[in-house]
A protein has these predicted regions:
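C-terminal motif of bacterial Sec signal peptides marking the signal peptidase cleavage site
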Residues: 16-20
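Solvent-exposed helix-loop boundary motif
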Residues: 22-41, 45-124, 133-134
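Bacterial N-terminal signal peptides that target proteins for export
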Residues: 1-9
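Gram-negative bacterial Sec-dependent N-terminal signal peptides
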Residues: 9-15
Length: 134
């Protein structure tokens, strides 16, 4: 009886620990501190997409293989997402900003360390600058 209970407990722990995104993108679960945004002239290819790759797009959360979720794997996926998550020129109207700031629904990235203030400001600046594909 004790062995069966212990086995059931182990299975339950495995199931709970495997729920959510399929990979721990940042090995230690930490924030991607190696990505630093400038105050202005934010580059999608140098700053935004690498941040998405480390925190959102490639962990089974917002990648191309995950159905029914916003995909953050390319500029066109981000801009033409359904629902619309980026309103070019309007960070305060962008669901993406509201989610990473924790002002709408669950804070993103889900079950990971939040983005640091520089990264949040960088995403805001990128959107304010027109969410360019640069």
């Amino acid at each position: 009886m004790i062995k069966q209970s212990l086995c059931s407990l182990c299975v339950a722990v495995l199931l709970v620990s495997s729920s959510g995104c399929k990979d721990d993108i940042i090995g230690d679960g930490g924030s991607p501190s190696n990505i630093v945004f400038p105050v202005s002239d934010v580059s999608y290819s140098i700053h935004v997409q690498p941040l998405f790759n480390q925190t959102c797009a490639l962990g089974g959360c917002h990648d191309d293989g995950t159905p029914d979720r916003v995909k953050l794997t390319s500029h066109s996926n981000v801009l033409f997402a359904n629902p619309q998550v980026v309103v070019e020129g309007s960070p305060d109207q962008s669901i993406l900003v509201l989610r990473i700031e924790g002002r709408l629904g669950q804070n993103m990235p889900l079950n990971r360390n939040p983005l640091n203030q520089n990264q949040i400001n960088g995403i805001r600046a990128w959107i304010a600058e027109g969410a360019r594909n640069n």
